[in-house]
Each structure stands twice: as C-alpha cells, then as structure tokens.
Amino acid sequence: MSAQVMHNRVMGTVKDSASKLVDFLMRHHGQTVLLTGAGVSTDSGIPDYRGPQGIYSRNKDFKPIQYQQFVGPHEFRQRYWARSFLGWPKVSQAQPNASHHAIAALESRSHIAGCITQNVDGLHRRAVVIENPNLLEIHGTLHWVNCISCGYKLQRSAMQEQLQKINPIVYEWQRLNPEKSNADVASSLNPDGDVEIKWDYNHFKYPHCPECNGLLKPNVVFFGENMPMTVRDTSFKMIDDAKALLVVGSSLQVYSALRLVKRAASTGKPIAILNLGFTRGDELAQIRINLGSSAVLEELASTIR
C-alpha cells in the first residue's frame, strides 16, 4: 500500500490536484463521502490546531479543556466561559470560505453523498441555501448550549446575552475593544471558539440551567468526553454506505476521525486526502495532496459540473 500511496501522491499545481480529484469523484458516481477538519475553516479566520499558524504552533503550552475539568471544580467553568465569552463574537461572525462553498456546490450537484465534519463552527451549515440532511457534525456545534442534567437547550447567542448582563465590566471592555486581540484581556482565537485570557477571571459569572439549576455546557464533544452513540453509529453508516472517502483539512490526530479512515480502508474503499501537512492516514490513502483546501476545492467545483 505504501508504494501505491507514493505513486499517487500529487506534488503539482492546484490545477493538477483538482484534476486528480475530479477523476476520483467521477469514478465513484456521487457515492464519495467527505470528512473535513479544522483546515477547512482557517480561511474563515478560525485557526486549526496543528497547521503552520495553528494554536499548537503559536502556543506550545496550549491545553484544551477536558470534560472532567469542565464538570469538576467551579474555577474551570469560570475560565472556560470567560474565554468563550470573548471568543464568541469572532466565531458567530465568521463567514464560510471557498472550501465551504465548493463543498456545498459539489453536494448540490450530487458529486458527494454526504459530509462528516470534525468542526464545531457551523460554517458548513451556513454555506448551504437549504438545510443539508447529509451533514454530520461529529463533535457537535458551538451554536447551541445544553444542560448536562435535564437536556434543556438554548442558542449560544442567548447564552452570550446572559453572560453580558452578569459580567458588565468585561462586556464593556469587549464593546470598546472589538478588534483588540493581544491586549491585557485576550489574545488570539482558538479552534474551539475561545481565546487565551491574561486577566483574573475569578469574578467572572456564568448562568445555570433555568429549569433544574444544572450545568450548562456548549453542545460540543470536549476532549475526554465520549461521542454520543447515535452520532458514532451514523458516522459508521455513512462510511459503510459510501464507495470512497475524501478527507479535507484534517491531520486525523483525533481518533474519532482516524477510525473512520481506518474503517473505510478495512473494506477496501479508495481514500483521497487533501491536507497541508502530515496526516495519520497518509499510508492509507491512494491519493495524497499536500496543499491547502480552498484553492483546490474551488478549482474542483468550477471544473466538475
């Protein structure tokens, strides 16, 4: 398999790479499923984890919050919600980029069977005119908040309004400094929608569930948290029903994504990977393109009709 991967590694131009993917999609007659990662959203201003400008490159000490921390001591939730409060405006205002629009176009033309995304930014949904039933957000979405006790749900925008009301000093700073990203309060945005904070957040307040006084948590799968079984099973079925898999913008470092690639490979499904930088699935791919996603997907969508 390794020799086959090297033989099909595309080292040429954007046009060459797009041409290779045109052949890949056409060969599988609309039964290719996509798996997308953070690299798809970098052109929308949301950084990835491991890319050249990713959070791990910018901050070697970065550690995302763990599920057990969030449900543990109060201080962890204070820190999380303070960071999320400051990061939310940029996430909520982010716009789909060329990658999202190209993927939406490919699906509308029936060239792909569905899209499994690791991203929690909601940009795949914003790129389509009609709600896409074949989009699966395996790690959830930042746009909703759930009570972990009773299941009460509210939109993240409503949560932001509540946080503004009970933290007027921080809100006033944010209102007066909407573009300030490296000041005393906050530095740059992280992939999970929060920011690094450089101030004492011990007085930051956050609301509890209005129904049962339980803990409110963003509707995302934290590190150390199990993916819902229904989501896992749906992702497996999408892979099983497909004839091929195209991975875009993911290093496949997270097991929930890597296992989908391994599942496809275990049944002999052809795999193509478009990602700038190494991925854990490289040895399983028949086509490997080491480029960013936007230019290649835009060329692909403009070529294939």
Swiss-Prot record:
Residues 11-305 form the Deacetylase sirtuin-type domain. The lineage of its organism: Eukaryota, Fungi, Fungi incertae sedis, Chytridiomycota, Chytridiomycota incertae sedis. It comes from Batrachochytrium dendrobatidis (strain JAM81 / FGSC 10211) (Frog chytrid fungus). This is NAD-dependent protein deacylase SIR4. Its main location: mitochondrion. NAD-dependent protein deacylase. Catalyzes the NAD-dependent hydrolysis of acyl groups from lysine residues. Zn(2+) binds at C147, C150, C209, C212. NCBIfam families: PRK05333.1. Belongs to the sirtuin family. Class II subfamily. Residues 1-10 form a transit peptide. One of its GO terms (cellular component) is mitochondrial matrix. Binds 1 zinc ion per subunit. It is found in: Mitochondrion matrix. Keywords: Metal-binding, Mitochondrion, NAD, Transferase, Transit peptide, Zinc. Its cofactor is Zn(2+). PANTHER family: NAD-DEPENDENT PROTEIN DEACYLASE SIRTUIN-5, MITOCHONDRIAL-RELATED. NAD(+) binds at residues 37-57, 118-121, 249-251, 275-277, 293.
